[in-house]
Curated annotation (Swiss-Prot):
Pathway: tRNA modification; 5-methoxycarbonylmethyl-2-thiouridine-tRNA biosynthesis
Pfam families cross-referenced by the UniProt entry: CTU2
HAMAP family registered for this protein in UniProt: CTU2
Main location: cytoplasm
PANTHER family: CYTOPLASMIC TRNA 2-THIOLATION PROTEIN 2
Name listed for the protein in its UniProt record: Cytoplasmic tRNA 2-thiolation protein 2
Cellular location(s): Cytoplasm
Recorded family membership: Belongs to the CTU2/NCS2 family.
CC terms in the record's Gene Ontology section: cytosol
Keywords recorded for this protein, A-Z: Cytoplasm, tRNA processing
Length: 380
């Protein structure tokens, strides 16, 4: 159960206002209102950049990627509430909101129905829903991505390119990794096209801890300064993680206590701790890390927070953004050391692995996901 519920609330008053408490958050008994304020404050303090600026001709626009999971929906809810508070106090807001949902070919949810509900509940913002195959249409340097699609006379449309690319991937981890990477690329392009200066990701502390270990395990640890920290990204946009100080179980408690129908907008297969697939063939690195941290946060939340706090201390080199970039994930690769042997690795998946990737501009992590056949067929 998210949070430690208090059986006898009269014996455990809220530590902040002395009203009857409803749960214990990190050893602190809190009432309903103080807990809601706790979540809001954790999020809003990360948005000092978007305070009301009376001298600005127009407010900056931010993009909120929606997955209809607990974190992204809660983030939109808190941002909408924060905007209303700004407007009631100053007559204007500090930022404009755009939201986008990327259709996942491996998920089947009623996205349009959920998006209509979100539009109705949080009106006044811009909303969009994009198919993932639009990444082949919108990415300006799409030739680099298209070169990773197996050559076939039938792969002429964006839909076909995506199908062939996904079908060419040899493991569940590879498919999950590439799909996530393509989603990020598409979200970034949509942000640029809609005039957004920043992307506000809904990653909780738990999610960022998961990402820290999974990206490292997949060979993309060098990208962590941009994947878990607030600030400029290699894409020319600012990345922000407003929920970075909130555990997923705290977001679940917030959702369950919300009085605005927040729960009806959330579509997650499992609200509690994730259970990994019983089949090792279908289990991904992301699944394992998600299962681990969602179970650890129940009794040892400080471990989860420490992982994120430590990863956030990582800094990219000053000239990192001028380095050559990976064709797939678009992350800067130090010294252009692409592929397995560029990083001095000695892992091989078969004969001629080094020559297969020798001329490919894909990083170590992406090299592990993209099969040999794909790269060798399109090698330069």
């Amino acid at each position: 159960m998210p949070g430690k519920e208090i059986v006898d609330a009269s014996n455990e008053p809220c530590r902040r206002c002395k009203a009857s408490s409803v749960l214990v958050v990190r050893s602190e008994p809190l009432c309903h209102d103080c807990f809601a304020r706790y979540i809001h404050t954790k999020c809003i303090k990360r948005l000092e950049t978007f305070r009301v600026n009376f001298t600005a001709e127009q407010q900056p626009r931010v993009l909120v990627p929606l997955s209809f999971g607990i974190s992204s929906v809660t983030l939109l809810h808190v941002l909408d509430l924060h905007q209303r508070t700004q407007k009631s106090k100053t007559g204007r807001t500090g930022f404009n909101i755009s939201a986008v949902y990327i259709e996942d070919p491996e998920q089947s949810i009623m996205a349009e129905d959920l998006l209509d509900q979100v539009r109705e509940q949080y009106s006044g913002h811009q909303y969009a829903s994009l198919p993932l195959h639009d990444v082949f249409r919108l990415v300006q340097d799409d030739a680099s991505i298209r070169s990773l699609v197996p050559e076939t006379q039938y792969a002429s449309t964006p839909e076909e390119k995506l199908v062939h690319m996904i079908n060419s991937l040899t493991s569940a981890t590879a498919r999950a990794d590439v799909l996530s990477t393509l989603k990020t690329r598409l979200i970034v392009e949509h942000a640029k096209l809609t005039g957004c200066e920043s992307i506000l990701w809904g990653d909780s502390t738990t999610r960022l801890a998961q990402k820290t270990l999974s990206e490292t395990a997949k060979g993309r640890g060098f990208s962590l300064p941009w994947q878990v920290s607030d600030g400029p990204s290699p894409f020319g946009l600012n990345f922000h993680y407003p929920l970075r100080d909130v555990l997923k179980k705290e977001l679940v408690s917030y959702m369950n206590m919300a009085e605005t129908g927040l729960k009806t907008l959330v579509h997650e297969t499992s609200i509690g701790a994730t259970q990994a697939s019983t089949s090792s063939k279908n289990t991904t690195i992301d699944d394992l890390m998600k299962q681990y941290f969602e179970s650890v946060e129940d009794n040892f939340p400080s471990i989860v927070a420490n992982v994120v706090r430590t990863a956030s201390r990582l800094e990219a080199q000053p000239d990192a953004l001028s380095e050559p970039k990976c064709s797939l994930c678009s992350m800067p690769v130090s010294g252009g050391r692409f592929g397995i042997h560029g990083w001095g690795g000695d892992q091989q998946d078969g004969d001629d692995f080094g020559s297969t990737h020798a001329n490919r501009t894909i990083c170590y992590g992406c090299t592990r996901s993209v099969p040999k056949a794909t790269s060798s067929t399109n090698g330069n």
